[in-house]
């Protein structure tokens, strides 16, 4: 069943990309120009939004970002202290996690597995 779903998604994405590439009459320059205009509009919109942020909030965000940089440095230092074997294991583990992430998303979005409205969950909320 899962293989059929993945196969169906692959086919639909492939045919969709093919159809988009063959049906498009825009030249690469037109696409680039459109992307530049869209990008500039997004930047302008964000600048307007960012102008509404209070100075205290900006300072808070800056402090947050500095702390995140410090945390990431510490994570790199911890990782570099690991043995090569441990680093290799973590790299392989990450590859397996990435392989599992797509099927996991498909399963999570399956209506049969969605129990948010089940009677059991409603009973627990009422207690």
UniProtKB/Swiss-Prot annotation:
Keyword Signal: yes
Region (Disordered): 102-127
Lipidated residues (S-diacylglycerol cysteine): 17
Keyword Hydrolase: no
Signal peptide: 1-16
GO cellular component: plasma membrane
Coiled coil, from the record: 56-101
Subcellular location: Cell membrane
Lipidation (N-palmitoyl cysteine): 17
Keywords (A to Z) from UniProt: Cell membrane, Coiled coil, Lipoprotein, Membrane, Palmitate, Signal
Transmembrane annotation, as ranges: none
Membrane disposition: Lipid-anchor
Stated name of the protein: Uncharacterized lipoprotein RP051
Lineage: Bacteria, Pseudomonadati, Pseudomonadota, Alphaproteobacteria, Rickettsiales
């Amino acid at each position: 069943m899962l293989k059929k779903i993945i196969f169906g998604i692959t086919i639909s994405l492939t045919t969709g990309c093919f159809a988009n590439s063959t049906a498009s009459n825009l030249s690469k320059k037109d696409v680039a120009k459109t992307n530049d205009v869209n990008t500039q509009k997004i930047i302008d919109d964000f600048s307007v939004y960012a102008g509404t942020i209070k100075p205290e909030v900006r300072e808070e965000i800056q402090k947050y970002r500095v702390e995140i940089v410090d945390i990431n440095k510490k994570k790199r230092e911890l990782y570099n202290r690991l043995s090569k074997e441990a680093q290799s294991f973590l790299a392989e583990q990450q590859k397996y996690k990435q392989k599992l992430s797509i099927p996991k998303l498909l399963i999570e979005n399956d209506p049969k597995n969605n129990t948010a409205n089940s009677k059991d969950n409603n009973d627990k909320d009422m207690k």
